[in-house]
Regions:
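Catalytic-core segments of class I nucleotidyltransferases/pyrophosphorylases
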Residues: 22, 31-35, 66-134, 138-153
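Conserved beta-loop-beta/alpha segment of the NTase-like Rossmann-fold superfamily
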Residues: 1-62
């Protein structure tokens, strides 16, 4: 992310999404939510499967969706709120990416930046409006091909 910021000389709000995910919903509501909160934001969804929780970022939120804590791949998830890799960074928070890296955030793990950022400033987590499909291997790709029906607005 910092590479893109530097190379493209980005100086604006940013929408960052992992390329191995497909969504069945529009991102318009997410962007509107983030702009309404006037903070950086992520998405979250309720994950009931304990095994899947061990493989994702998990957030604890308050009644206003403010992130109180985020952990990546915790052996003891604190909640069932899983965070897929969909991030909206405000312009001011995008400028902190290098500081986050310097503080130990992984350059190939954007969730670690959110975990760090929510301790520096307010970050919110919007409940996902639909389903996401994670394409991690050929089997999941084939499953998505058979199930995916496109974006619902």
């Amino acid at each position: 992310i910092q590479f893109a910021i530097d190379e493209l000389k980005l100086d604006d709000d940013m929408l960052v999404i992992a390329g191995d995910n497909v969504l069945d919903f529009s991102l318009t509501k997410f962007i509107e939510y983030a702009k309404g909160k006037n903070t950086s934001c992520i998405m979250r969804y309720y994950e009931s499967d304990e095994k899947k929780l061990l493989k994702c970022g998990v957030v604890t939120i308050d009644e206003s969706d403010k992130i109180l804590n985020m952990t990546e791949k915790s052996p003891n998830p604190a909640t069932h709120w899983c965070c897929p890799p969909f991030y909206y960074y405000t312009k001011s928070d995008a400028k902190l990416v290098q500081k986050g890296i310097d503080s130990g955030c992984g350059t190939d793990a954007p969730g670690s930046y959110i975990a760090w950022l929510c301790k520096q400033t307010t970050v919110h987590a919007m409940e996902m409006a639909g389903k996401r499909y994670d394409i991690g291997n050929l089997e999941s790709y084939e499953k998505v091909k058979s199930e995916y029906k496109g974006i619902e607005y």
